[in-house]
Amino acid sequence: YNPLTWQDVITLTRIKDISSLDRALAFLHRAYSYVERTEYYKLIRLLVKERLDILPAEVDNIPKIIENKLLYFIKSLGYNEVLVYPNFLSYKEMVNIDKLISNQIVLPCQPRVETPDSKVLIATDFDQRFTYILSEKDILQNFIESVNLEGFFCNKKTPESWSYKIIQGEEKLDWSEDMENYYKNKI
């Protein structure tokens, strides 16, 4: 199978932009309590009616579709082991990268994968559908090119909820209405 890019999903759904797509995905797994009605229904239509082979973004985990690519890239930098830990524990375990790649060891939820010298950190936070890669800009640029990643550069001023916006009026859809529509099969 060929993975879809986020731009592919935007094109297939005709969702306005990456921020609207992120809000729809956040609402889908209930990280946001409301969403733009038309944008959300575009995503749902794609997932449940048009393309049943598409899985929405994984939450709380590094997406399986890129996990090994990221680990292979870290190996290409000369590392054989990484520190692995969840975001809610301070204990860090040194793990052989090959054991992660072969699934002998599985990453925890909300994982942190860090090189022993702290030059690279890959992290997925609680209830988030995106993965952060922290490093020096030249390493990040190589990551992007070799792993074929989509995204954007963040800094200390980029909020975690970068796509969040207040939605009002008829366009606002909340959880209770969404569940009611789900049970009535109006989607």
Which functions belong to the PLM regions below?
Residues 1-100:
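Extended, low-hydrophobicity segments enriched in charged/polar residues
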Residues 5, 11-13, 38, 115, ...:
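Residue-identity detector for threonine
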Residues 19-20, 33, 76, 90, ...:
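Generic serine detector
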Residues 47-50, 63-76, 117-124, 141-146, ...:
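Hydrophobic alpha-helical membrane-spanning segments
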Residues 75-131:
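Short helix/strand-capping turn motifs
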Residues 122-187:
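Alpha-helical oligomerization segments
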